[in-house]
C-alpha cells in the first residue's frame, strides 16, 4: 500500500504596515484553532537581542547570529511593539543573511505543523509560495495612518497624524523597492482592500476564501 504525506494547510497573509493583516491573521487563527506567526516580530526580536546586548545594528554577522538563535515561541508582542525596536528592526530587516536565516525559521514553523497562519510582507511570495491560500491585505495610506494614529492614542500616548502618514509612505516605498523580497502580492493571492471594511467584514470575506481552500485541501 502506498503511503502519502498530506501537505500542511498554510494561510499566508501579506500586506503593508497597518493594513489590518495582523488583526485579521489573529482572528483567523483563533477561529480555526491554528497556530499563528507574526513574522514581523521575528525581525523585531533580532533587533531587540542586539539592543539588549549593546551591539551594533549595522553588523550583519552579529545580527545573523541573533537570528539563528531566535526562539519563535518566546517572542513577546507587547515588548516587541515598542517604537524604538521597530526603528531598529528596519535596519536589520534589509540584511540578506538575516532575511535568509529568518525565512528559513519561518518556513520551518509552517511546514512542521498540520496547519498555520503566517502574516508578514513576503509569506506568499518567498516564505510559503505553496501556501494553500494567500491573502494580500491592503488599505489606503490615509486609512492605515488613521488606524495607527488611533492605536497610539488608545495606549495613552501622543501622536502626530501627518508624521505617521509620512512614515507609512516612506515605509511602503522602502518595502516595495527593496532588492530582497520586495512587498508585492503573489500572482495567486486574493486581494482584500480593507479601506472601508470593518474587522468583521474583512474576516468574513477571508473566511469564505479559506473555507473553500480547506474543502479542496481535504479533497
Curated annotation (Swiss-Prot):
CDD domains given in the database record: CMPK
One GO-annotated biological process of the protein: pyrimidine nucleotide metabolic process
Top-level taxon: Bacteria
Chain ranges passing through the membrane: none
Cellular localization per UniProt: Cytoplasm
Assigned EC number: 2.7.4.25
Major localization listed first in the record, in broad terms: cytoplasm
Catalytic reactions of this protein: CMP + ATP = CDP + ADP; dCMP + ATP = dCDP + ADP
Keywords associated with the record: ATP-binding, Cytoplasm, Kinase, Nucleotide-binding, Transferase
Sites where the protein binds ATP: 15-23
A molecular function GO annotation: ATP binding
SUPFAM superfamilies cross-referenced by the UniProt entry: P-loop containing nucleoside triphosphate hydrolases (SSF52540)
Gene Ontology CC: one annotated term: cytoplasm
Family to which this protein belongs: Belongs to the cytidylate kinase family. Type 1 subfamily.
Annotated protein name in UniProt: Cytidylate kinase
Source organism of this protein record: Brucella canis (strain ATCC 23365 / NCTC 10854 / RM-666)
